[in-house]
């Protein structure tokens, strides 16, 4: 999965543990959206996580 272009938040890895306590690999992906963003007055498509979008770190084009 993609990384956030602003905060570089990416996937986290760990184990999924079943009821019988067997472990298998699990990935938690960041909530990343493809967004058109203003960069130096031009519109550019970037992957941005929703926490950066909500906090106003980027300006949509």
Curated annotation (Swiss-Prot):
Among InterPro entries, the record links this protein to: Bacterial_rp_bL28, Ribosomal_bL28, Ribosomal_bL28/bL31-like_sf, Ribosomal_bL28_bact-type, Ribosomal_bL28_sf
Query: MF terms per GO, please?
Result: structural constituent of ribosome
Q: Report the Gene3D superfamilies cross-referenced here.
A: Ribosomal protein L28/L24 (2.30.170.40)
Q: Which Pfam families match?
A: Ribosomal_L28
Gene Ontology CC annotation, any one: ribosome
**Does the record bear Transmembrane helix in its keywords?**
no
Its BP terms in the Gene Ontology are: translation
Asked if the keyword DNA damage belongs to this entry, the reply reads no
Q: List the disulfide bonds.
A: none
Q: Which UniProt keywords apply?
A: Ribonucleoprotein, Ribosomal protein
PANTHER family associated with the record: 50S RIBOSOMAL PROTEIN L28 (PTHR39080), LARGE RIBOSOMAL SUBUNIT PROTEIN BL28A (PTHR39080:SF1)
Similarity comment: Belongs to the bacterial ribosomal protein bL28 family.
Q: Which HAMAP family match?
A: Ribosomal_bL28 (MF_00373)
- Protein's name according to its UniProt entry: Large ribosomal subunit protein bL28
| Species of origin | Lachnospira eligens (strain ATCC 27750 / DSM 3376 / VPI C15-48 / C15-B4)
């Amino acid at each position: 999965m993609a990384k956030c272009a602003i905060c570089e938040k990416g996937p986290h890895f760990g184990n999924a543990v079943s009821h019988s306590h067997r472990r298998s690999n699990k990935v938690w992906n960041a909530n990343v959206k493809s967004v058109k963003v203003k960069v130096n007055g031009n519109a550019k498509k970037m992957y941005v996580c929703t926490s950066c979008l909500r906090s106003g770190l980027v300006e949509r084009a």
